[in-house]
């Protein structure tokens, strides 16, 4: 199975927002309360469009990945695998692509954060070797060394 990361097009914001809402609504709503207007503005103002990629496997869209380069690392803002494709080890394969890209670019780490209440995501990232580097009541920051 061939994984492709295809950068989103400028006219795809509504689709991206729909996927982000589907993937994060329950966690954001439980912690902060969900507000569509706030979340739209946040995505438009705090994230660069070129950080977002559709995830394709065998030419079928299976999810959305948002990550950015910084310092000597990549930071994964979100990985959403569509519900019908979950529990098929696709998330791990996508993260392996990110890890390999980081190594190819000479980056030593991949970092991310997760809601503390998102237990399945935390189990997933820890199973890939991610270690908690910071925590507070609602979030954990995690990091994986991918190169020395």
Please provide the spans of the model-predicted regions.
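A short beta-loop-alpha structural element at the N-terminal edge
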Residues: 3-18
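Conserved GNAT-fold acetyl-CoA-binding loop/helix
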Residues: 21-44
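Conserved active-site tyrosine of GNAT-family acetyltransferases
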Residues: 43, 125, 130
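Conserved beta-strand in the GNAT
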Residues: 54, 60-68, 75-80
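A conserved beta-turn-beta hairpin within the catalytic core of GNAT-like acetyltransferases
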Residues: 68-77, 86, 108, 136-139
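Conserved acetyl-CoA-binding loop-helix of GNAT-fold acetyltransferases
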Residues: 81, 87-100, 123, 127
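Conserved GNAT acetyl-CoA-binding A-motif
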Residues: 102-114
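Conserved beta-strand-loop-alpha-helix junction that forms the acyl-donor binding cleft
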Residues: 112-122, 138-143, 147
């Amino acid at each position: 199975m061939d994984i492709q990361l295809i950068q989103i097009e400028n006219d795809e914001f509504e689709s991206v927002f729909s996927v982000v809402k589907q993937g994060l609504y329950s966690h954001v709503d439980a912690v902060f309360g969900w507000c569509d207007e706030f979340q739209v503005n946040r995505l438009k103002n705090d994230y660069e469009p070129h950080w977002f990629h559709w995830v394709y496997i065998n030419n079928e869209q299976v999810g959305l990945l948002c990550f950015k380069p910084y310092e000597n690392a990549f930071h994964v803002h979100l990985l959403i695998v569509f519900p019908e494709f979950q529990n098929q080890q696709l998330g791990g394969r996508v993260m392996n692509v990110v890890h390999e890209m980081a190594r190819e670019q000479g980056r030593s780490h991949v970092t991310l954060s997760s809601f503390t209440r998102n237990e399945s995501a935390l189990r997933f990232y820890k199973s890939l070797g991610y270690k908690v580097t910071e925590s507070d009541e609602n979030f954990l920051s995690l990091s994986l060394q991918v190169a020395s």
